[in-house]
Structure formats: C-alpha cells, structure tokens
Amino acid sequence: MTPIVLLTRLLVGAYPQWIGSSPSDKQRIYFANHTSHLDTIVIWSSLPKEMRSHTRPVAAKDYWVKGAIRRRIAIEELNVVLVDRRRSEHADPLEPLRDCLREGSSMIIFPEGTRRPQAIPSEFKSGIWRLAREFPNVE
C-alpha cells in the first residue's frame, strides 16, 4: 500500500461500498460531486489496488502542476489526466480524456467541472455525456 493510500485510509476511512456493482477490470468512468481537492485522492485510494493502477483521475492542470508536492502526487502517485481549463480555439479539453479511454484506462471525473461546497451537485458539463456517447462500451 502506498503512503498516500495508507494516510488517506487512516485519516478519512476511504473504503468502498460496492452497491449494485462489484470491483472488476472492466473499463469505467467513475463520477462524483466535487467539494474538495481531497475528493480525487479519497476516491482513488478507496479503489482496490489492482484497479488503481489503471484508473486515472481527471484534474485541473493549473492547480495540480503548481508546486513540487502537488505535482508529485498528481503525476507520480495518481497518474492524473491533466486538463487545461483555459479556453483555446485550437485545443479540445476532452482530447486528453479520450486518449485515456482509448488507452484502456478507467477514469475518475467530476462532471460539474469545478468544486462546489454544497452537498447538492450543480449542473453537469456536457463532457461526460459526450464521452459516454463516444465510448459506449465503457461503463
């Protein structure tokens, strides 16, 4: 168990409850409400070890590449898919997510596109819908 997983499980108690599903190697998109930067680490740490190696959280590049500790957690520990939130005419923000799915990895995504302190989710961005249509065999 990696130090980040051990620490997260000790501090937060990140253990999954599989309701209506069970752990499997099937490619999936896990999605959740996003209230804190810890959400990514907690969800990823709660997965069984064999699933963590091929499950990549989606994270905002501008936040996770700032500072050596964040960058190490994001890139070396979590193997995140970094998304540039700045709008660009020439770049499709979903392309790194598509690449991840084409490679056969599962993903953890927060479809609201940002953190929200309230427990009730806000409106989802269209990206998760587009990915579901483009990758119908992914659960």
Language model: regions and residue ranges:
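N-terminal nucleotide/polyanion-binding subdomain common to many enzyme families
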Residues: 1-8
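Soluble catalytic domains of membrane acyltransferases
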Residues: 10-139
